[in-house]
Amino acid sequence: HNGRRRQRQMCIRDSPLRQNNPAKMPLLIAILAFLFNIVNGYFNGTHLGSIQGYSIEFMSNWNFILGVCLFIVGAYINIKSDNILLSLRSKSGEYKIPEGFMFRYVSFPNYLGEILEWMAFAVMTWSLAGLSFMIWTMANLVPRAIKGHQWYHSKFESYPKDRKAIFPFII
């Protein structure tokens, strides 16, 4: 019973409903996100619905094992980074510079983690559907990270100059 209660507490603690100042999303972004999920849901559902192409032995292939490892790393980066960002939220709406963990290297490690998760899915399924989801995710998150990175630099004079937007030491 304690495990279930802890799971419920975690779900409530991490819920978007709990955020003090949730940012408003433009309608166009919401519509594009909806369309993105419809298209990718169709491609991946169609691919995974014809699962007869995968045998149980497939799970011992190098690409599946590598994909699982990448997914674990990506999920850890994503969740830990989101928790750091959530801890910075204040009731006053004041912005703070995120520090520590992957924030030492990039402004948006949560986006990096999500990209790694979908890269892992593409590697695990070794499919065009998985690859397309990874590419769509990158096409969405990389420009957002670059724009957000520029915003951080304009908002904070003390923002770390050597920190990249999304990929450590690269972009």
Question: Which stretches of residues belong to each language-model region?
Answer:
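Generic N-terminal leader/processing signal
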Residues: M10-C11, L35, Y42, Y76, ...
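Interhelical loop and helix-boundary elements at the membrane-water interface
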Residues: D14-I29, H149, F156-P160, K164
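Hydrophobic transmembrane alpha-helices
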Residues: G53-I171
